[in-house]
């Protein structure tokens, strides 16, 4: 039901955004809220008389401006004398637009100042004008080891092809699955990953929850429930399974990219879950670390009761423990990913989750997830991202401690976080990574999920990708990695039934699936994309149309996208 609500809401928002287009575009003011003075941009398609008017929420006029404008994008500075909520209206050649502004502290007068024409009118401006477009380039990454502009124009030689066992693969082999690719048959995870490597894979992937062990029913079958409710992720991302996958990577001598969710079972754009650190799951930490034991009250503390400082302390200890354990398997880790589709929360601090220090979060409903990216990034910064930045930094510190303790070089170790694009705009995506860097967590690579067939805030899914990648490159100075990508070869069903939107000429067929994958890679290598992970290539379940295999009686037979994979990624 939650997934259906998400799909419906995104579709409605796309329709509403499309209906508002005309020959005038007014950006949201920035900053917003503001102290006395703020800036706004007005784009007009044709020359003509223009006017701006500011009124309070009761309709009382505050200030106005009018004069002829030529076609293009024009910048204005607005000053308001009193604290309050205001409406800014713009009119030009019969078209109009308005935005709501929030003034926290009054300025010295009420006035609108015209600062000049800053750009020409383009289709891109028409579709997505924001004040951030015309700010100075971000310099928060000036000393970042990944800030190499040449690397963001051509990544062909170092492009990451993350074709990997999925988090579900171990369970599928345990259930008796086999996989056939051409004349090769894989009966073990190691055999399947070796085939992936022969087809161009450069790294493996694993996703980690804080649940330590798989749980079973009395009859010996997996108990796929969490807190008494059915949960498809209940026995997929456990610590034990992660260690097994890391040992496979070590044996095959291929780097692995761990994704540390800091959630008990799972997290994504639809929900942020707190970690759980049961005493029976982490006996070594309770036995050896007094700080851990004290903060978590010997295993009895609730995450929602902890201060932000204590949460970060625990996360740092956990990050060190995780890195110690993963590195002890002998595997090579060049890239660490923190969180999964983490637009709206991480490690138990996010929209709709109770905590001890910001009650606004617990009261925020699901609508906030889909409206904030469009209309109130300031709210995400104030109530979500400010806390998450500290959490990410804490986990990173812990991981780096493990490297130092082991005497391992970290010059090639990179950190990333990936966010969902279906619930975001290019502006919001870049703002996320910029804000994190400004507040202590500068990623080396910016991660995104990109599902072209899923409902999103943008009708044009191709532009959603290209604008998101290039905007992050431009505003943040880092490459982008697509942490999740897939496209269906036939109609999706069940909870993913809404993920059936065809993109352009890419049909829902084996050919269309292979073609879009090829074209995204080809474009990305020349445009700031450093790699791609085809999500869950070997998973059946209700995901099978997205998979790289056709399934029958627990036998997976490779689709065209996989049999031709080596040529596709070259």
Q: What name fits each language-model region?
A:
Residues 7-14:
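Bacterial N-terminal signal peptides
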Residues 26, 49, 58-84, 93-95:
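Glycine-centered tight-turn motifs at strand-turn-strand junctions
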Residues 20-43, 60, 101-120:
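Surface-exposed, proline-anchored Ser/Thr-rich loop/turn motifs
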Residues 194-399, 403-406, 411-414, 420, ...:
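Substrate-binding cleft and catalytic face of glycoside hydrolase catalytic domains
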Residues 121-202:
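Boundary/entry segment of secreted carbohydrate-active catalytic domains
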Residues 192, 259, 385-386, 404-415, ...:
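Glycoside hydrolase catalytic-domain groove-lining segments
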Residues 129-130, 134, 138, 183, ...:
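Aromatic-rich peripheral "rim/lid" segments of glycoside hydrolase catalytic domains that contact
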Residues 178-198, 315-325, 425-437, 514-521:
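Short, acidic/polar
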